[in-house]
Amino acid sequence: MELMQAKMPLRGEVKIPGDKSISHRAVMFGALADGTTRVTNFLQGADCLSTISCFRKLGIDIENTQEEIRIHGKGLHGLTAPTEILDTGNSGTTTRLISGILAGQNFTTTLTGDASVQSRPMGRIIKPLSMMGATVESLKGNQCAPLQIQGHPLTAIHYQSPVASAQVKSCVLLAGLYAD
């Protein structure tokens, strides 16, 4: 092995691509915060844009440019009932995570998605959200989307998911924000 000495120090700037998981959660936490949240390096992919679309339909003002997004949050209880079905597109992450938030609202919401989302298992979130006090129904009766979520005051639970899933954990943790 030969060790070579650098002739000059390494300098530069590296821009890391946006992260899908962080981008989804940034929108959600920004919407639930009081005031404006500024997010740079947001991943402008279809799944993350579905999350933005859903929160706009829940009454959250979100400005989106290529440089940043600004989310004008209204606090934990500031979401408003949507006037239409929330379409999560092809985003299972949006579907599962937003379900935890909707479970603690004082209104009913219907979530749907594309054919792929409608074939993905949602029983893994229906069970804990129901245990917490929400009414969550698979409208096709197959434990998949579309889901109708009637929010209620929630109760804290001890829950061990039978599947290892960051989405299930995040869903339950987000619902926990509304639990007594």
Feature names for model-found ranges:
Residues 1-180:
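Structural preference for solvent-exposed beta-strand-turn elements
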